Amino acid sequence: MTTTRTITRPDDWHLHLRDGEVLKDTVRDTSRYMGRAVIMPNLVPPVTNTALALAYQARIFAAQPKAGFKPLMTLYLTDNTSADEIKKAKASGQIYAAKLYPAGATTNSESGVTSVEKIKEALQAMQEVGMLLLIHGEVTASDIDIFDREEIFLQKVLAPIVASYPNLKIVLEHITTANAVDFVNNAGDNVAATITAHHLMFNRNHMLVGGIRPHLYCLPILKRNIHQQALIKAATSGAKKFFLGTDSAPHAVNRKEAACGCAGCYTAHAAIELYAEVFEQAGALDKLEAFASFNGPDFYNLPRNSDTITLEKSAWDVPASMSFGNQQVVPIKANEQMLWKVL
């Protein structure tokens, strides 16, 4: 007898769709069963104001194969983001958060924030109007080891922000360490975190042992197994502070398989299926719905989706590559079997 599991339609609380001709592919994959997604603003040029965010949202809507998927837009914080722009974004009703990228931390973050001191007026305005702060939690100093950047960020940057803005809702995105799990668990109810499928499925050995696997290279970088296990424990615990955010971040194959390859894993082709595999292995399939469908909207003060999707325990083969505009993207688990599929 085939095993099935029906859950409330999930959402993706951290997604990169990119822009231009690739939107038809990225929007197709996510909108297949995600009700909503928080859209990252690190385009070129970045989405730094309300007008740019609304124009980007219109392009996403135009790329939808069918109606029903809602992109939740964000602003890209810079040293020059004003309190007035935050208020304007909030008033639009379409912009739900602002994203703090430390300058140079990840893809297209060169225009990011150089010092939290420079965005204090924007943060105060966000606290006043109820706009969420989304954070890429890594320091970028060249003398800091790449595997330590999240841990040091928690101490040096995030802790002071949390202390200075006690009513600001904060999402520490794509957490990768036991340190981040502990920080979020010990913080107030205004602090939460997203966890990606690839940080749950893989650790740095998967990326580096027996040959380097560029399609597992992402930022924040995969960490030790002990950190992977801490993430699995957090995600499958039922704790309301942790929720689904794929950080699905496609790059064309030639940008990944290169002497200096780009950071990012493409998981939107099989997002909920990947999470289901992890939760099943942890003996926690009963906790998947809260993680994928309840905790995110609850934290954002948005209604949960009213419809459902059904997962079936049925193997299928992930293709070697997928269309990405006029190029190709190699998805996570390319040429491998998935154990679950969405009906």
Swiss-Prot record:
Its EC number is 3.5.2.3. GO terms for cellular component: cytosol. Keywords: Hydrolase, Metal-binding, Pyrimidine biosynthesis, Zinc. It catalyses: (S)-dihydroorotate + H2O = N-carbamoyl-L-aspartate + H(+). Zn(2+) 1 binds at residues 14, 16, 99, 247. The active site is at residue 247. Binds 2 Zn(2+) ions per subunit. PROSITE patterns: DIHYDROOROTASE_1, DIHYDROOROTASE_2. Zn(2+) 2 binds at residues 99, 136, 174. Substrate binds at residues 16-18, 42, 136, 219, 251, 263. It comes from the Bacteria. One of its GO terms (biological process) is 'de novo' UMP biosynthetic process. GO terms for molecular function: dihydroorotase activity; zinc ion binding. Catalyzes the reversible cyclization of carbamoyl aspartate to dihydroorotate. Belongs to the metallo-dependent hydrolases superfamily. DHOase family. Class II DHOase subfamily. Homodimer. This is Dihydroorotase. The lineage of its organism: Bacteria, Pseudomonadati, Pseudomonadota, Gammaproteobacteria, Alteromonadales.
